[in-house]
Amino acid sequence: MSSLRHATEIATTRWPAAAEPRPAALNHLHQLEAESIAILREVAAEFRKPVMLYSIGKDSSVLLHLAMKAFHPAKPPFPLLHIDTTWKFRDMIAFRDQRARELGLELLVHVNPEGLAQKISPFTHGSALYTDVMKTQALRQALDAHGFDAAIGGARRDEEKSRAKERIFSHRSATHRWDPKNQRPELWHLYNTMLAPGESMRVFPLSNWTELDVWDYIQLERIPIVPLYFAARRPVVERDGALIMVDDERMPLRPGETPQWRSIRFRTLGCYPLTGATPSTASDLAAIIREMRTSRTSERQGRVIDRDSAASMERKKVEGYF
């Protein structure tokens, strides 16, 4: 495994010559942008100590760009928080550090110390336990340790059915639990931000965006993203119906497995052992957008953690997962 070289390097986003966005599409994106910026400003005005969760993916990149716009020329009045499972793609970590440094933002990184001490990994403990310990419990630890009362994230309603029924301002109990049967109405863009002692709020400014909206906005605003979203030849193994990229020497190969170099890209990014790639030749933004316009599958089809059970995402969210 040590002979497998690092397949990709941090690079600037590829900007091919592209047609100007249609006026209707441009107006739609501007409306989404205005709504998201208003939500970010509402969070800054209403909460004592907010934080923005930065998962390094395309949605987080758009959210970070919106936050920079919302408070320009000042910096966003909240830090970034990354929950590091220690199993993210190497390109993601390099990109995370690069963006925080370029923008001069405060970046908080938290790893669950108990999970680290127990050497919890997706290979030895399974995806369900690993996700609970290294993501859900780690997030709760970080929010409690810093006393954050609002956590902003880039989840969208079109991603997954449990997220589709969640409010933009999503109330959490003092133990960070979500009750899908007890949600607050959000009529006419009016949000109830009241919290009892110990409670908190999760806020989703991109709730009404679609995957295609995100890509159109990335192209329009020239937002830097992780190179893994672009197709390139990378080492993968086919495992349990998913193309898993061999990102470092820690990944144990099963009997008969040999990494093959294939042209792939990722529609969604997470921990590399639990994130399936998509065969693709879309190596620039225009090609990705063309691909998205004809896609009939969910971007989360490659997420192994979503296969735990039919209601796994909702259960995770009830327990405190973002």
Curated annotation (Swiss-Prot):
In terms of superkingdom, the source organism counts as Bacteria
Show the SUPFAM superfamilies listed in the entry.
Answer: Adenine nucleotide alpha hydrolases-like
Among InterPro entries, the record links this protein to: PAPS_reduct_dom (IPR002500), Rossmann-like_a/b/a_fold (IPR014729), SO4_adenylTrfase_ssu (IPR011784), Sulfate_adenylyltrnsfr_sub2 (IPR050128)
- What pathway does this protein act in? Sulfur metabolism; hydrogen sulfide biosynthesis; sulfite from sulfate: step 1/3
Q: Give a GO molecular function annotation for the protein.
A: ATP binding
* Catalytic activity reported: sulfate + ATP + H(+) = adenosine 5'-phosphosulfate + diphosphate
Q: What class of enzyme is it?
A: transferase
Q: Does the keyword Nucleotide-binding apply?
A: yes
Pfam families cross-referenced by the UniProt entry: PAPS_reduct
Entry keyword set? ATP-binding, Nucleotide-binding, Nucleotidyltransferase, Transferase
UniProt-listed Enzyme Commission number(s)? 2.7.7.4
Q: Which CDD domains match?
A: Sulfate_adenylyltransferase_2
Protein's GO biological process: hydrogen sulfide biosynthetic process; sulfate assimilation
Q: Where is the signal peptide?
A: none
What role does it play? With CysN forms the ATP sulfurylase (ATPS) that catalyzes the adenylation of sulfate producing adenosine 5'-phosphosulfate (APS) and diphosphate, the first enzymatic step in sulfur assimilation pathway. APS synthesis involves the formation of a high-energy phosphoric-sulfuric acid anhydride bond driven by GTP hydrolysis by CysN coupled to ATP hydrolysis by CysD.
Q: How does it assemble?
A: Heterodimer composed of CysD, the smaller subunit, and CysN.
Name the family.
Answer: Belongs to the PAPS reductase family. CysD subfamily.
Q: Identify this protein by name.
A: Sulfate adenylyltransferase subunit 2
| Organism of origin | Bradyrhizobium sp. (strain BTAi1 / ATCC BAA-1182)
Gene this protein is translated from: cysD
